[in-house]
């Protein structure tokens, strides 16, 4: 009986891998948690040269010639039989198994260490970092935030040397400005935006030099 169950598990893993090879990783259950991790892993890989694959698909830990990124869809499809089956149990494909497999294969501990999911701003406020893909395909660390919550912040934080992109919102959460240069924003676009905001929300504090109190 145990041998039959093991064979069924092996057949299931083979079928899943074949489906991925034929139709891509979209065949796998990717929830928000998995998508967010994959974006962070790709950001990490983009900004470190010690995390690539060579022609035979093996991982290399030194700077050298590489053909495709380890976290790319192309490589994940190519190597699916290596990273996915060890995490499949039974005959049900669960998102947690896919997440765990990717986390192990893409060295999630290093991703967590270098590409945080949250950040503390200079004014002491905790913010969630998103890793959004821009139109040109570049992944940027991004914070969507009401503009008053960055009052008292004058230097743009960075992740692996990349400035965080701020999507600034009005108190009603309407888009105001997008910037990755806070110092330039305060001296440039802010005076005109502030004038408009004061007219719409006269009871709010608009002194950007002082951090907003909770």
Placement of each model-derived feature along the sequence:
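Acidic, serine/threonine- and proline-rich low-complexity intrinsically disordered segments
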Residues: 1-117, 159-214
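A generic structural micro-environment signature
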Residues: 125-128, 133-137, 149, 153, ...
């Amino acid at each position: 009986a145990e041998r039959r169950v093991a064979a069924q598990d092996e057949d299931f893993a083979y079928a899943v891998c074949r489906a991925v090879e034929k139709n891509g990783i979209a065949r796998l259950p990717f929830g928000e948690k998995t998508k967010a991790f994959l974006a962070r892993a790709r950001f990490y890989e983009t900004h470190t040269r010690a995390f690539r694959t060579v022609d035979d698909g093996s991982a290399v830990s030194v700077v050298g010639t590489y053909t495709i990124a380890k976290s790319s869809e192309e490589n994940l499809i190519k190597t699916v039989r290596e990273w996915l089956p060890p995490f499949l149990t039974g005959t049900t494909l669960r998102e947690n198994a896919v997440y765990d497999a990717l986390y192990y294969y893409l060295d999630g501990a290093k991703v967590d260490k270098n590409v945080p999911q949250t950040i503390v701003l200079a004014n002491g406020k905790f913010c969630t970092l998103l890793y959004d893909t821009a139109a040109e395909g570049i992944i940027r660390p991004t914070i969507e935030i009401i503009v008053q919550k960055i009052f008292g912040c004058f230097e743009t934080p960075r992740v692996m040397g990349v400035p965080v992109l701020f999507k600034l919102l009005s108190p009603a959460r309407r888009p105001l400005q997008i910037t990755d240069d806070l110092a330039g924003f305060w001296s440039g676009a802010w005076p005109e935006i502030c004038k408009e905001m004061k007219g719409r929300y006269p009871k709010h504090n608009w002194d950007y030099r002082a951090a907003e109190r909770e």
